[in-house]
From Swiss-Prot:
InterPro entries: Hepatitis_core, Viral_capsid_core_dom_sf_HBV. This is Capsid protein. A motif (Bipartite nuclear localization signal) lies at residues 162-179. Keywords: Capsid protein, Cytoplasmic inwards viral transport, DNA-binding, Host cytoplasm, Host-virus interaction, Microtubular inwards viral transport, Phosphoprotein, Repeat, RNA-binding, T=4 icosahedral capsid protein, Viral penetration into host nucleus, Virion, Virus entry into host cell. The keyword DNA-binding applies. Belongs to the orthohepadnavirus core antigen family. The modification Phosphoserine is found at residues 159, 166, 174. Signal peptide: none annotated. Residues 158-180 have a biased composition (Basic residues). Residues 150-187 are annotated as: Disordered. Homodimerizes, then multimerizes. Interacts with cytosol exposed regions of viral L glycoprotein present in the reticulum-to-Golgi compartment. Interacts with human FLNB. Phosphorylated form interacts with host importin alpha; this interaction depends on the exposure of the NLS, which itself depends upon genome maturation and/or phosphorylation of the capsid protein. Interacts with host NUP153.
Length: 187
């Protein structure tokens, strides 16, 4: 069974696989970023968003993998076998966790739509033959104007918005019609 964990977010595992392996930060940096930006939302009891849930799940998976590696390291006597297993875990499962954390952190930071646009534009760029593509790859480093990053989650108090009065409108939205004079009125 081929399950795509990004399907519900409008993306795909295949699309993320076009990004080079060294594109994704190391796990410690991603965990530090998640903790610094969203610790309250990740440890709180309330459900914030599917992205928060996915980050929680990725962190739980990585924690379990770390425990497995520690157990294998202490129980496997052959240094060569231990190195092969640790490298395999880091190159396969570790990469999947890095991809997942990067994707969901980016969606929370930049907005899901912006991340999807970036992925599509990067795939188009990388699949275009070098002589025909621009020299620089698309980057996900600037915040679009419509993205707002809120600190403190949904529980933060917000000041009420002031509304500017709208211009007065005519009662009827249809165009005004002039009364045409009847031919008998001209007589």
């Amino acid at each position: 069974m081929d399950i795509d964990p990004y399907k519900e977010f409008g993306s795909s595992y295949q699309l993320l696989n076009f990004l080079p392996l060294d594109f994704f930060p190391d796990l410690n940096a991603l965990v530090d970023t998640a903790t610094a930006l969203y610790e309250e939302e990740l440890t709180g009891r309330e459900h914030c968003s599917p992205h928060h849930t996915a980050i929680r799940q990725a962190l739980v998976c990585w924690d379990e993998l770390t425990k497995l590696i520690a157990w294998m390291s202490s129980n496997i006597t052959s240094e060569q076998v231990r190195t092969i297993i640790v490298n395999h875990v880091n190159d396969t499962w570790g990469l999947k966790v890095r991809q997942s954390l990067w994707f969901h952190l980016s969606c929370l930071t930049f907005g899901q739509h912006t991340v999807q646009e970036f992925l599509v534009s990067f795939v188009v760029w990388i699949r275009t033959p070098a002589p025909y593509r621009p020299p620089n790859a698309p980057i996900l480093s600037t915040l679009p104007e419509h993205t707002v990053i809120r600190r403190g989650g949904a529980r933060a108090s917000r000041s009420p918005r002031r509304r500017t009065p709208s211009p007065r409108r005519r009662r009827s939205q249809s165009p005004r019609r002039r009364r045409s004079q009847s031919p008998s009125a001209n007589c």
